[in-house]
Structure formats: C-alpha cells, structure tokens
A protein has these predicted regions:
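RNA pseudouridine synthases
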Residues: 1-298
Length: 298
C-alpha cells in the first residue's frame, strides 16, 4: 500500500496532508522522510508529526480555573460550568470556555487552535471535548457526524414524564429570532431524542419527596429526573423537544423561565463515549453533576 493511501484511510484529509508538506520531518518512514508514493511494508515504522505554529488570533487568553476530566496529546475534555458560552461572540469576547482554554495552553507553552467537537449551550454543564490537533479534530468530527459518539445527558423537567420515550420532531429557527428554535414539521431539520425517567419528585408540605409510579397523580408541583441520548444534534434540541411534549426544563430563560427550583436550565452533559482518534481505545468520560443540579430538590 502506498503511504498516501494509508494516511487517507486513517482519516488524514487533503488539507492536513498539504499543511505537512513544507516540513521535512512531518512524515518519517523508518527514520527517513516519507513521501506519498512510498510503499509500506509489514514491520515498517511510521512517525507522524503535525506542525502547528500559530494560535487562534481572535481568542484572548483569560485566566480561569478549568476542571479537566481527561487530557492527552490529542484531546482535552473539560467539565464546562454553567453561565459560560463555549466560544466568543458579539458582546462577549473574554468570558468563554475558549478564553480559558487559550490561557491553559499558553501557560504550557503550546499553541492553541480552538477545535470544539460537541457544542454545549451557555447554561448547559458537563463534558466538552476539544481536539488538540487537526487530525484528532477531523476524526472526532467524523465520529460526531456519523453518530458514533454516544452522548448521555441528565436533565430535570417539569411534571412526571412517561417511563421512557422517543421524540421525533423536526426543529427549525423561530421566525423573527436568531436564537430561539421551535418544532417545524415543514422546514425543520430531523431531530430525534431518546429519554428515560430515572426518578420523580413532588412537593408535599413544602418539601420535595420521591414519587413512585404507583403514586403518580396530579401533583401541584412535580419534576422528573431524566437521562437522554441524542440521535441528532440540533441547536437547543433537548430543550425544544421536552417543551414540545409538555415537560419543559425549569429555569430555561428562552423556553420556560420558571426559576422556582433552579436559576438556569438543569441540563448536564453527563457522559461521552467515543473511540480515541489515535489509539482507537474506547473512551468513556463522565462529568460529575454540579451542585445546583443535585440540590434542586433540597
């Protein structure tokens, strides 16, 4: 097999390979410079170095205390806090996860290009993957596109949901809004969410208590703790889908601004399962549940 064909089969795009051409040591075959037409044989030693000399220009490094869930030379998984966008936007150039990551890499003397794999909303917490190089970004992005990254979320929603269910309802942009989304059967994009109820709580004499299926009735104030898996990844998908079936997330400033038990939407990226882009090891990264989420019923 030719070296070029081998690299393409492993996920190296034309863009990545082109960026490596000026560097003589980028591809080494048995200790010598490798070329696209070099022939690979069993037992050969192939070393790949992807040079990166410049950081993202428009991301200001800002010192932050980042909670690192996992890190190696190819990827970084951060436990994202609430009230923090993942990247800068108009009006917010310095209080984002990207700013904190830029500082983190600057302190380590490393270049930083922001490569976000799974985007999270401003008030959504939990596991968030950053790719450290173009190759790991390409492989992980392909996994995301092909639905090979299993994303498990936890959420608190109003009311007592069915024990489990699947929501298959297209989502599109709300007319007149650049942010809000809605169910749009005509122009919306396919969106599928699977959920399972883990627990239910109802207000009794001023205190929240667990509710069993046998006790289910019309409580004045009740909530469900649910686990969700996304088959697709539309903007605000969980928030829009749960509102659609009559169980919105409390504390959601866009879709249900009820702040009686929590001051932001209780949505948490709890677990990510994926194949490591280089080692091919099956990874399972879990993010601890934040305090305001776990204390919502206390």
């Amino acid at each position: 097999m030719l070296l070029l064909d081998f690299l393409r089969s492993k996920g190296f795009s034309r863009g990545i390979l082109s960026s490596m051409k000026p560097y003589k040591g980028a591809i080494q075959l048995n200790g010598e410079r490798g070329f696209g037409k070099s022939v690979l044989h069993a037992g050969n030693f192939l070393r790949i170095h992807i040079p990166e000399t410049e950081s993202s220009e428009n991301i200001l490094p800002v010192k932050m205390d980042l909670s690192i869930l996992y890190e190696d030379e190819d990827l970084l998984v951060i436990n994202k806090p609430a009230d923090m966008p993942v990247h800068p936007s108009i009006g917010n150039y310095d209080n984002t996860l990207a700013n904190g990551a830029a500082w983190y890499f600057k302190e380590k003397g490393q270049t930083f290009v922001y490569r976000c794999i799974n985007r999270l909303d401003r008030d959504t917490t939990g596991a968030h993957i950053l790719a450290k190089n173009p190759y790991s970004a390409a492989v992980l992005s392909a996994q995301m596109k092909q639905r090979q990254i299993r994303r498990t979320y936890l959420a608190i929603v109003q009311g007592i949901t069915p024990s489990h269910g699947t929501i298959n309802a297209p989502i599109g942009r709300t007319d007149g809004s650049t942010i809000e989304r809605q169910i749009d059967p005509v122009n919306g994009e396919r969106a599928v969410t699977h959920y399972e109820r883990l627990a239910a709580y109802a207000l009794h004499a001023g205190t929240f208590s667990p509710v069993s299926d046998a006790q289910k009735t019309d409580f004045l104030q009740a909530y469900s703790l649910i686990e969700l898996h996304l088959e697709t990844g539309r903007t605000h998908q969980i928030r829009v889908h749960m509102k659609h079936i009559g169980h919105p997330l409390p504390g959601d400033f866009l879709y249900n601004p009820d702040y009686s038990i929590i001051k932001r939407q209780p949505l948490h990226s709890y677990q990510l399962e994926f194949t490591h882009p280089v080692t091919k090891e099956v990874m399972c990264i879990t993010a601890p549940v934040p305090e305001d989420f776990s204390n919502a019923f206390h």
